[in-house]
């Protein structure tokens, strides 16, 4: 299956999503903020970046810009619980696959990941 980097500052959500995606057969790695996520992207090869938008150190918008510049083929799926953050992601339409609204149910994030990987 796919190798997915999950970048989310909320520990419980990050590990919850990682466990669910591993049950689907994906390999997952985790990062707690955008800077750590970018470092992991530079050290590995990933099929998908699944990132929260609102995080400390480096937010998901900046991470998406830098990740897409360094890795043009990388698929990016963002998550947010804030409407204004979703609007900020509109500028990334050419760089990301979609934005998933939080809170979400497990079937929702699994479907979003499957769609992103198929895109």
Question: Where are the language model's segments positioned?
Answer:
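Receiver (REC) domain active-site loop signature in two-component systems and cognate sites
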Residues: 55
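Alpha4 helix (beta4-alpha4-beta5 surface) of REC/receiver domains from two-component response regulators
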Residues: 62, 82-100, 107, 111-114
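Conserved phosphotransfer cores of two-component systems
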Residues: 42-44, 66-74, 89-94
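Active-site beta3 strand of CheY-like receiver
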Residues: 45-50
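Two-component/phosphorelay signaling modules centered on CheY-like receiver
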Residues: 11-29, 116
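Acidic catalytic/metal-coordinating carboxylates
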Residues: 33-36, 59-63
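Conserved acidic carboxylate
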Residues: 8
